[in-house]
């Protein structure tokens, strides 16, 4: 079973992907917990110097980011193995990969990486090796809401929630696909 710290760090990383910060409400929504639980957990992460909080914005520290980089490497390596080698249904992959990534053996992970010929990205477009902390602090990615109508975008990755995966499969969307922004719905 994954630790509560690991779950929070992964969720902070995922919810702060384009703006490099998140808030209690986003964490509570993504984790399916009450806001009070988030406050308690974030305060614990602050005391461990894994995150900082300023004016409601929760950000990973360098130490927290280093832990996330290791977590995401193991998690995404397991995603690839489950999708490509086991051919598990894509909506099932994230949950099972998260459980498997609790294996904290660098030897096992190195062998798995070697067996799969050193893949670079997960089935959902996430990089196995995260960028350096200094690059992480200065995002170059944009959210879809910030792209003007009429511009083209290329799908390079997406959040691997079951709902998102089902949406991509149902809509025929795939990594590498180029789309034109026709309209925006800020209500979603």
PLM feature segments, named:
Residues 6-20, 148-152:
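Short amphipathic alpha-helical interface segments
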Residues 18-28, 155:
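Short acidic, hydrophobic short linear motifs in intrinsically disordered regions
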Residues 27, 38-48, 176:
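Basic amphipathic alpha-helical segments that dock to polyanions
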Residues 36, 91:
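Key DNA-contact positions within bacterial/archaeal DNA-binding proteins
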Residues 46-56:
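A short, conserved structural fragment
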Residues 56-75:
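Basic, amphipathic "hinge/linker" alpha-helix immediately C-terminal to the N-terminal HTH DNA-binding motif
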Residues 101-188:
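Mid-protein regulatory/catalytic core that forms ligand/cofactor-binding pockets
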């Amino acid at each position: 079973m994954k630790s509560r710290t690991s779950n929070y760090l992964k969720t902070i990383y995922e919810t702060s992907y384009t703006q490099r910060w998140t808030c209690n409400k986003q964490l509570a929504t993504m984790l399916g917990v009450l806001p009070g639980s988030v406050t308690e957990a974030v305060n614990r992460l602050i005391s461990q110097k894994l995150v900082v909080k300023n004016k409601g914005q929760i950000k990973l520290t360098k130490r927290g980011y280093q832990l996330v980089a290791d977590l995401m490497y193991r998690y995404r390596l397991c995603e690839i193995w489950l999708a490509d080698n086991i051919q598990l249904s894509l909506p099932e992959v994230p949950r099972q990969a998260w459980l498997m990534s609790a294996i904290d053996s660098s030897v096992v992970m190195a062998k798995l990486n070697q067996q799969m010929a050193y893949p670079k990205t997960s089935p959902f477009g996430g990089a196995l090796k995260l960028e350096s902390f200094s690059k992480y602090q200065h995002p170059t990615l944009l959210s879809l809401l910030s792209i003007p109508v009429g511009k083209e975008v290329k799908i390079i990755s997406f959040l691997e929630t079951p709902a998102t995966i089902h949406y991509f499969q149902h809509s025929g969307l795939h990594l590498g696909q180029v789309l034109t922004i026709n309209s925006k719905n800020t209500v979603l």
